[in-house]
Amino acid sequence: MKKCLLISLVAILILNAASFSQTNMSDQKYKWPENVKPPVAEKKPKEFTAHGDTRVDNYYWMNDYFKKGADSAKVVSYLTAENNYYKAMMASTEAFQEKLYNEMRARIKEKDESVPYFKNGYYYYTRQVEGKDYYIYARKKGTLTASEEILLDVNQMAEGFNYFSATGFSISPNNKLLAYGTDSKSRRQYVIRVKNLETGEILKDSITNTEGQAVWANDNKTLFYTAKNPVTLLSEKIKKHTLGNAESADVVVYEEKDPTNYIGVGNTKSEKYILIVSQATLSSELRYVSADSPDQPFVVFQPRMKEVLYDIDHADNQFYIRTNKDAKNFKLMTTPENATSVENWKEFIRHDDKVLIQGFDVFKNFLAINERKDGLTQVHIINTKTNESHFLAFDEPSYAAGVGYNPEFDTDVIRFNYTSLTTPASIYDYDMSKKTKKLLKQQDVLGGFNVKDYVTERLYATAADGTKIPMSVVYKKGFKKDGKGPVMLYGYGSYGASMDASFSSTRLSLLDRGFAFVIAHIRGGQEMGRYWYEDGKMFKKKNTFTDFITAAEYLIKNNFTSPKHLYASGGSAGGLLMGAVVNMRPDLWNGIVAQVPFVDVINTMSDASIPLTTNEYDEWGNPANKESYYYMKSYSPYDNVEKKNYPHMLITTGLHDSQVQYFEPAKWVAKLREMKSGNNVLLLHTDMEVGHGGASGRFKVLKDRAREYAFILALENITQ
């Protein structure tokens, strides 16, 4: 049920206001096919009783493909029937979808290269070549004028697969070996392999069912990795692998007994220590061992404390600790290497009710801290020798900035990232001593993109409880605030994930056709601090939905749009948001796009065999608890579908989704078809090859966006 941003592509058409005027949009409605009948799902009532309450689920049989039950084939037949209905209904938009795809792709600089970073004697970078979907990973020794050494060509690795993902690239300390993970099923169950970079040989070592990331010890032969439960997909063991040994000989160095915790393995920036983290929503615990002594047992850094989160890094013979102990928005502390328990922690940066500390990076003479204030990110630089501090300056009303990947310790230069709704992704080097910055690369947007053609705003809507809800807005000059403008409102609002204002070249295909795009920074995210998250989870979850509705009402009241021209989109937990708001206020929207939506809250959170369920009890609640059960039931989209008119809806899923299983959106659509009145279009598209993240290639994902945009644009009678 969790969360990445794909920065995409570019237009061959420059569309003028006369071609897609807001007046024309409101004059006519798109004519959908009338003689195509939607599938009618079979009803097989199944009763669930808890806390004296009985729910009847007529479509629970759709779980059978996941459960490998008797109705597995029938599930596939139903999904296929829905796909056929989708195809028939969208047939007249296929040429338009292709046009959208082509213009999105035309914005991409297909032959491109990342900014190199320097680590342990080599410059590392990625390349993309024209016409190919995936990255080539490469390096050069010592200088950028040296000959190129290709580490992995993912395009070659992906040949023959409908889906392919490579992740977790990790170079051994002696620079001779590369560990990496691959997934060809889209279930996020990675196989770790090791490549000899001197000979090009792929070693016989093959480690299955992992998170994909391996951490090297300093002996260049010992790897630590996270092993998954094959059914629930929970990360449940940290194992140690010695090169040359069979996977069956791997040693469990940590086993997580509490299924509500996530676990993972990493190392400190100094690479002196290997770390194991065990973290739930509300608390964490870390263990560490010297990277020089991988056979020694891991030592607990500080035993878990109730409702206390902490994470650490290491530099100059001490640990830095970010923690929310007595500090809701987190603070920074330090402790000696040989005294890591909490009584030895000393405050380095005090807590601030108005500033959320999101993360930090350590250098020989400086600390760089990712912070958030008033809903916007900021980069705070502290000289650890003089205690002098300053902030990087950013001028736009809405933006996203943060410290990038900085593997070097002994340097005064930090790399940071910057983007906004109108500024393509940009990478800078900043000299923390001289306070000067240098732009290294900005995402190329082809096809005549001009930042001066677009306008951004930062707006605030007032919720019923008086809370100010920030919104980031972008539109092309010429957008009229006359109540007739089409607006796409986007939201997420879960897990404390902040939806910052970032650039998307695909989005230009909406903006250039007269749309405004709005991000509602609703509670459940962390845009305004930790309390913003806590006010949008568990028994305050409904704030997420009412905040989004408040944002929509603001846009209507202030003449950005009207219900005839207002659209909403969200995916995963944002799909839950879509399901909740169409139940609560179906009258506000002309159309909805819900991607891989988490909508069957009670059933999913009651079934511990479903991946990730137990990890998320502190996010949604555990239905075994009576109070949680009834609160979750009061907003669960699937449980609250009613006999009423719903807006036009496009719902997408992937058959192999490991985060939100396919059956949630499938059941939801079946129930909506049964209950809804009116003639508004309801479509379900299931990708039979992929999972939660959608298509794996940089071009394939554009097909998904083109499909969604064609649906929304057709509702505005825009088909060119």
Please give the residue ranges for each predicted region.
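Beta-propeller folds
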Residues: 7-8, 12, 16-17, 21-413, ...
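Conserved beta-strand segments of alpha/beta enzyme cores
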Residues: 150, 252, 436, 516, ...
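Cap/lid segment of the alpha/beta-hydrolase catalytic domain
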Residues: 155-169, 180-187, 198-203, 430-436, ...
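Residue-level signal for short, function-critical loop segments
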Residues: 325, 366, 494, 572, ...
